[in-house]
Amino acid sequence: MMKHEFYYTSRDSVTKIHAIEWLPDREIKGVLQICHGMVEYIDRYDEFAEFMSEHGYYVVGHDHLGHGKSIQTEADLGYFDERKGNQYVIGDIYQLQEMTRKKYPDVPYFMLGHSMGSFLLRQYLTMYAEGLAGVVIMGTGHQGMLTLCAGRMICRVIAAFKGWKYRSTFVDSLSFGGFNKKFEPGETSKEWITSDKKKRDEYVRDPLCSYTFTLGAYYQMFTGMKVLVRKGSMKRIPKTLPVLFTAGSDDPVGAFGKNVTKVYEKYKDAGIKDVSIHLYEGDRHEILNEVDRQNVYRDILTWIGERNKTKAES
């Protein structure tokens, strides 16, 4: 297995997007593109990416704008352009897919999105799902239109006084404030992330996982999420696209499984034929960093392998 870092120009025409590819030592069975979550970065997926690469998959992913190494200065951490940030982030995912397809045009192409990356991937599917062999939607959730509109309005009001690069603890608290409630008393306020103490401590100590989103980033994230709750938003998703929803049963982002199931049911109701759900009992938000993560890895590998075989036979 070989790991290689590279950069490409963001759709914002300014930022250099940092990306990593994990290349297997054997013939490539398929491609897996990963979309990471909020306030983290792609190299945190190294253990899982190595596992998939060892089993013959080319894995690739990038740091979203305002994350990891996809910044110009440290002040850019947690910042999206307040006008077109969501458009740029989606565009960067598409660019990476196009580059990767040119390298490997003849193998099945899978995608995985975690947390914020799951919301981005769900939005992405309403535009660019054609030709995908399957997608894994991990650690997702659901917010209603009124909640998202209220969130955008609050961002606009505060930004009128503080500017779009302001980091509002109030907005941050509205978004994440209640997530740790079930796990109190805790040492870090991040117990909701994973039950694996070692992984959790690494997360808490990591400066690239401990900043606050700017108002511009929150505003654009809420803007993108609005797409998901618009009537008819899933009409453009191919009915034959295999979709796996997966999360921890103790993940507050998905309302402890309730909202993951809700989104899963929406996909079924939209007529998508191969849609399934797997909730891991007792796991929290980052199932790829949980104590039973090897089981999660194997389950994802099996699910992708089954769809890969189907794709090869069709």
What kind of region is each of these model predictions?
Residues M1-R26:
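N-terminal cap/lid segment of alpha/beta-hydrolase-fold proteins
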Residues L32, H36-E40, S115-M116, S249-D250:
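Active-site glycine-rich loops that stabilize anionic/oxyanionic intermediates
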Residues R44-A75:
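Conserved alpha/beta-hydrolase
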Residues D81-R101:
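Alpha/beta-hydrolase active-site loop
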Residues Y104-S115:
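Alpha/beta-hydrolase fold nucleophile elbow
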Residues Q123-L208:
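Alpha/beta-hydrolase-fold enzymes
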Residues F245-A247:
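Short beta-strand/loop motif that positions the catalytic acidic residue
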Residues A270-S314:
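Catalytic active-site module of serine/aspartate enzymes centered on a nucleophile-bearing elbow/loop
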